Amino acid sequence: MVCRPVFPCRRRFCPRPFLVGLVVAICLFYQTLTLRGSRKLTAAAPGAVPHTSTETQASRCKKGFSQDKQCFLLSGNAQETRKVKESMETHFGSHGRRAILYRPPFYSKTELQLHQHILTQHGYTVVIAEERLNAGLGPGLLEQGDLGSWDLLICLSSKKAEGTPCISKEVMCQLGLHQKANRLPEIQQPLCRKEGLCQIVRRFPELQLPVSPSVCLDQGMQLKPSTSSHLLKTVKPRVWKPGDWSREQLNETTVLAPHETIFRAEDLSVILKAYVLVTSLTPLRAFIHSTGTVWNPPKKKRFTVKLQTFFETFLRASSPQQAFDIMKEAIGKLLLAAEVFSETSTLGPKTFHRCRFCFQLLTFDIGYGSFMYPVVLQVHEHLNFQDYDNMDFEDQNTEEFLLNDTFNFLFPNESSLSIFSEIFQRLYRSDVFKGENYQKELNQCLSLEEINSIMTFIKELGSLGQFQLLFPSTTPGIQSLMHEFYDVANPVGNPGSVLTQYWSLLNVFEQFQFMNKKTQPHPLEWNSFTEDKNIEKPQVPFDAIENKKAAVPQIKNENKEIHCSDDENTPCHIKQIFTHPHLELNPDFHPKIKDYYCEVPFDVVTVTIGVETPKCLCKVHLYEQAGPSFASYPLGLGMNKISIFVVDESPAHGETLITYKLTIYREDRPSLPLFEAFTACGFVQDCGLLIHPEETCGLQPISSDYIEAILQSELKRCPSGDMKGQWIVPCLSCSDNRTCDWREITWQPHNCQYGVLTKPQLQQCLGGRKILFIGDSTNRGIMYYLIERLNETLQEWQKVHGTKFYHNVNGGKTLISYSYYPQFWISPSLRPTFENALEHLLQRSRPLENTGQTVLVVGGVQWLNSNHLQIIHKVLKRENLLNILVIIKTLGIGFHLPVDGVHFLTQSEVQNLWKENLIILDTAKKHGYEVVDTFTITMGRYKEFLQGKCGCHFHEVVKSKLSKEYNFIKMKRSRNHIMGRYFSNQSKLQQGTVTNFRSPYHVRGPINQVCSEILLSRMCANKRTM
């Protein structure tokens, strides 16, 4: 129950002053007793850390924690290791997982629910706390119940800027050793406020911090040297040299000119939001996520992208790894300056206890202008998107996986004690702790504080996931800066100690890399960058370097800067095409060549394409003539055709149109021919898209007894179309799917079989019947398969998006009608309802018998739900057709790819589809309808989709291979899979399903074939004649 504040204090009449004061005092006393949350934190949970009195906490804030005097000699023996582990658990450990979610007055419900879900998955009991406007979590609120009764505090972000932080420095010093919060006030306040950021820049003008001058101009301040920058050894002007950038270029981009240079969004070619997780201060530890959000101010377009793709493709840096390192150095310099600024600030207590496990996920807004050098525009104290009030599906998906990655990184299950002991022994034996970087020899004896710091760092390195190490940094510029800061003025008052901690972490990092070299050669870098050998060489265009085609597209421009001409006489054509992943175009790109072809392997399911033109009034559109200038495409198996429209909008040419065409062939799964000695392997779900995380994924060995059982001739017929089963494929090894013969794959239900009818049996079963289909393109694919099975040919085909009748099926003995639903291209207010569409189809198909001679097939990829089944029953009852055969084709996999033009489902949303699918199956059976469970069949083969933006099509109607139009690619067509040709005892019957290649058209797609055959078996299982 959420405890609400009581407001009995509002004046209804004019009482005496004494009564007013009494009532006010009662209200204030009540507020000190009540925690506004989803439950009260009044009882300490079992095993909680003993309560600490307010006096002790206040004293701690003034004096700080006394340093732990206990010392451990890590000899490597088991007894010493166990002793260290026990001491660590006593000193820092917690016996439970209890989290407080602090909800500010203006919060996001989506963010709240997301944190609840993620923390619950990590085993936390979640308590929601709220407080009055602008109050924050003060000492009194956190102290209620028991300060030791919780382990984790999460301050949710506020949609509106508030003056009071969620938790202050003064409160942080009262936290127990085991407690952590997602706030670091020491750097949050100076970094995430413009006035604080400006003060940092003014404090250290010699550093030429890469911060936009507009930050200080907004505050009415001038960027003049400050007399308080006494931490540096010298005040001589410095030019920082990240990587191999030229001195001239750095001078142009980093020198501050406050009265002349004002960065505005429209002046920047692109703004990148980089997400940085800070896990410690003094020593500073920080990590950067491999994903960022890009905002294109001129085009007002926002999209999420891997940082690797950003630097390779969108920023067009000649050396992407170097550009990334420069950005990391810029962020690292600012973080280090903020840490030192906080320690030497005159605001607040100068000595206070640090929260050893606290962390903060920051968002850095980084602008890139014409010089392609990073400039920090703003730092946000939480995950930030361009428009929080209008977050789209992509934003919500990005927030979800960023938070998932963050908490998986922070709360790994593995212990790091054993690897810590091994690393430490390696360092000590190699005399690393006695090197020149240390001011005195470091004894092998370490305190718990030192052990905890190094162990936490090792644990972080072992659970990086999508994060990469940002700080401590091996960059010479950053290391030089650390010497500048800490050799002269050490914040903790012990010269050299902070620097010693940094060196120890860097040495640990080096040893960790060495130990993991065999399993992960470059654990903290992008493996795909292959230009490292050329970093030390003068920068030249990559298209001028031999044998570098695999690193970046060959067609890239020589210059990093993008220029276009306003001259009307400049020809309008494509200057270059850039793609991710890199595509080898055939022929090589040339502006005058309009058609290109390339091939990609099976695992490449999407491609991002962008185009550059030399003329400013020459506009490029993908997909269609009004499409975007760059976009992500899904790549179905086989041929994918992409059109690139180039329009000259200059007045002299009157919007002339030029079309370029790109054909991308995506290969089938790598497959080996079937050998005599093979292993039967089965799978239900792919490990790349887990629907049931608790169940196995990928290929699993199948026993010979199981194979013998399903090959028995007396195996019973399946009683329904949703029997549980699995895909079975012969392989040399179930641990390597490249050793399988995927041509022989079959869908096999457990303990039963679906009968595959011969052509005469099927013609007899469907003779005299009317079959009505209503649904989307997935239903249409099954309909075309049925027509081809009955006629052995498909004479006509079109992508029907309305209502169509087929009278020439089965020699005219079977009538088939089809209605496309839903008509998503029509405005919702004008779009026909499902009830209207169904009534229209029934009326157009009359006369209809109220028997099994009339078959209604309803299905769609993801729009169908149980409410539609209620509507079907209502309409059939009204039309006196309750006795007809109704077959429900359930949901299917799709919309799982982040591509332009369609919505994108997160993994959790795809998992929710499974639950909805179960509801549809249950509701259909209650109404007496037949079902075909297409979701279970498609989810394990989600990568095997064919053409279409949705990634949901498992069928394709193609012209016959005899067509002259397809002669040049006939050997590249995907194979026509025969359902269960090897494993099933139906093999002889199934030979009759081989395609008649004299047909003008053919429906291909093995998964659609399986679903269609199950549907046909249900049509003919119990032919109703009532």
Swiss-Prot record:
Keywords: Glycoprotein, Signal. It comes from the Eukaryota. The keyword Iron does not apply. GO terms for cellular component: endoplasmic reticulum. Glycans are attached at residues 251, 404, 413, 737, 791, 985. Residues 1-34 form the signal peptide. Belongs to the PC-esterase family. This is Cadherin-like and PC-esterase domain-containing protein 1. It comes from Homo sapiens (Human). The lineage of its organism: Eukaryota, Metazoa, Chordata, Craniata, Vertebrata.
